[in-house]
UniProtKB/Swiss-Prot annotation:
PANTHER family: 60S RIBOSOMAL PROTEIN L23A (PTHR11620). Gene3D superfamilies: 3.30.70.330. This is Large ribosomal subunit protein uL23. The gene is RPL25. GO terms for cellular component: cytosolic large ribosomal subunit. Component of the ribosome, a large ribonucleoprotein complex responsible for the synthesis of proteins in the cell. The small ribosomal subunit (SSU) binds messenger RNAs (mRNAs) and translates the encoded message by selecting cognate aminoacyl-transfer RNA (tRNA) molecules. The large subunit (LSU) contains the ribosomal catalytic site termed the peptidyl transferase center (PTC), which catalyzes the formation of peptide bonds, thereby polymerizing the amino acids delivered by tRNAs into a polypeptide chain. PROSITE patterns: RIBOSOMAL_L23. GO terms for molecular function: rRNA binding; structural constituent of ribosome.
Length: 142
């Protein structure tokens, strides 16, 4: 029984031919989406740069200058907060680590704003272990 069904299936396939009908996929959108292909990670044979670039933002470049206005002094005295002008490209994490590196104090959090003149101002709230007034005296802007 098996050989005859196999033979009849082969006969049917031979009559049908190899170029059968292919079901066409109906496109419902006019935009063609490129299929996602395999993207291998790069493994370069040699470095393209002979020497890596120096650190563009170190602690001394991040903190530009302390701000010693009356409102900033009020923040120092009452809010345990230091106020600095910082580099426009620096972020809060970089500012926090720069203050730790330069002045050996831990910051609780950092608030930043960009002033109308295009510079960035940072309010660095210190932890209760440190006194902002002492740090400001040590820095020399009081």
């Amino acid at each position: 029984m098996a050989p005859t069904t196999k033979a009849s299936a082969a006969k049917k396939a031979a009559l049908k031919g190899v170029n059968g009908k292919k079901a066409l996929k109906v496109r419902t959108s006019t935009t063609f989406r490129l299929p996602k292909t395999l993207k291998l990670t790069r493994s370069p044979k040699y470095q393209r740069k002979s020497v890596p670039h120096y650190n563009r933002l170190d602690a001394h470049k991040i903190i530009v200058a302390p701000i010693a206005t009356e409102t900033a002094m009020k923040k120092v005295e009452d809010g345990n907060t230091l106020v600095f002008q910082v580099d426009i490209k620096s972020n809060k994490h970089q500012i926090k680590s720069a203050v730790k590196e330069l002045y050996d104090v831990d910051a609780l959090y950092v608030n930043t704003l960009i002033r109308p003149n295009g510079t960035k101002k940072a309010y660095i709230r210190l932890t209760s272990d440190y006194d902002a007034l002492d740090i400001a005296n040590r820095i020399g802007y009081i």
